[in-house]
Amino acid sequence: MDPYKYCPSSSFNTPHTTTNGGHPVYNDNSSLTVGTRGPVLLEDYQLIDKLAHFTRERIPERVVHARGATAKGFFEVTHDVSHLTCADFLRAPGVQTPLIVRFSTVIHERGSPETLRDPRGFAVKFYTREGNFDIVGNNFPVFFIRDAIKFPDVIHAFKPNPKSHIQESWRILDFCSHFPESLLTFAWFYDDVGIPQDYRHMEGFGVHSYTLINKAGKVNYVKFHWKPTCGVKCLMEDEAVRIGGTNHSHATQDLYDSIAAGNYPEWKLYFQIMDPDQEDRFDFDPLDTTKIWPEDIIPLIPVGRMVLNKNIDNFFAENEMLAFSPHMIVPGINFSNDKMLQTRIFAYGDTQRHRLGPNYLLLPVNAPKCAYHNNHYDGFMNFMHRDEEVDYFPSKYDPTRHAERHPIPNAVITGRRDRRVIEKEDNFKQAGDRYRSWAPDRQERFLRRWVDALSDPRLTLEIRSIWVSYWSQADKSFGQKLASRLNVRPTM
């Protein structure tokens, strides 16, 4: 018998209802009782099975990015980048690759309004011929911290107070006051882009520095940028309050309705490329996630376009069970020594195993669309039918062999084991540059948001003074305005 012929699927529905075991159900409206009013019998397995499944329908919520919307489409190469990478899906202009994208808010719970000030997730899974490739990014190009040992702490600070379950700005600003590298990310967070109008009008960034390797073995650092062809649009606070008060799923609905109407959203993918031999030329560390690579020095290189032209068929199967991880790379693309990236490689796969189980990569939305083979057997919810007798490698009885070798970074790394901060911190220059690039009205809105946040009565004078000092080092004029509005002096 074909083991896959009768796998559960909506295409194999019966004309009548059944139990999960396939038994016909002649009455799904009444429990089995003794008489018309008697007690319900424990032997009513139809009822027990239905209730037991219902009470287990929910799975653990994502610890971050719980609220999300998903769509499917394709990526098409539009420019030749084969001199930069040997990645098969980027081999030539015109090559198309199917993909799925998940947009999300970061901090708030599943079901929370999509109008809250919060970073947005921008995660893309490419189903390539060499396996899946995930770019797990955000709508900000930088992050609040540079070392992932503080990641649980920064998320705890942004999450609701464990006592009251209320998100409070004093907790955020207290924690981040110890980390001046967060200043540049706050220059996005409290900027207009802190509340995107919807997902279609939102940029995406890979945040981390990866490496590209070409066929000759040449390695370059790379950053990924997604630019929406319909432009970037944001919500002001009054608009966010009005929209969020009537539709807490406005961004999800906008994405779904646009695709259903044939108005397919599109983004252009760009690379920023840096030769590792040149990284010491800069006054910042290129592998620091709290820094951008200035585009006037390292310009954007066009690569291709992403088009989302199909809505998902089932929210749970293609959104809740969808799993991304930065460790999903393909030949021609590799990691850098970015501290945040190095630890996310472990953390994301680990949280998926907790949330979905050890066989989460067997779920259809996560499984590669190419042929694959390994000796990962058994485990909870392993529904793959396998009939091999050899479950080890190597073997004289199994022709499986190693894949053809592909180029990987081979830089020699030396150093002393230690817990240290990076040498080039430069925590203030880029934040000041960003602020000075804005028009006066945008600067005023940014100032007002900082004043509102720092006016939280739980914040001490010391913490307010620290932030005034940080911004005074980034831009003297802004620091003076902030100090004047708050009636405080900087501590530095």
From Swiss-Prot:
Renumbered residue ranges of the record's region Disordered: 1-25
Principal location listed in the UniProt entry: cytoplasm
Catalytic activity: 2 H2O2 = O2 + 2 H2O
GO BP terms in the entry: hydrogen peroxide catabolic process; response to hydrogen peroxide
Keyword annotations from UniProtKB, A to Z: Cytoplasm, Heme, Hydrogen peroxide, Iron, Metal-binding, Oxidoreductase, Peroxidase, Peroxisome
Composition bias, Polar residues: 8-25
Enzyme class of the recorded protein, top EC level: oxidoreductase
Domain of life: Eukaryota
Subcellular location(s) per record: Cytoplasm, Cytosol; Peroxisome matrix
Known function: Catalyzes the degradation of hydrogen peroxide (H(2)O(2)) generated by peroxisomal oxidases to water and oxygen, thereby protecting cells from the toxic effects of hydrogen peroxide.
Subunit description: Homotetramer.
Protein name per the record: Catalase
Record organism: Avicennia marina (Grey mangrove)
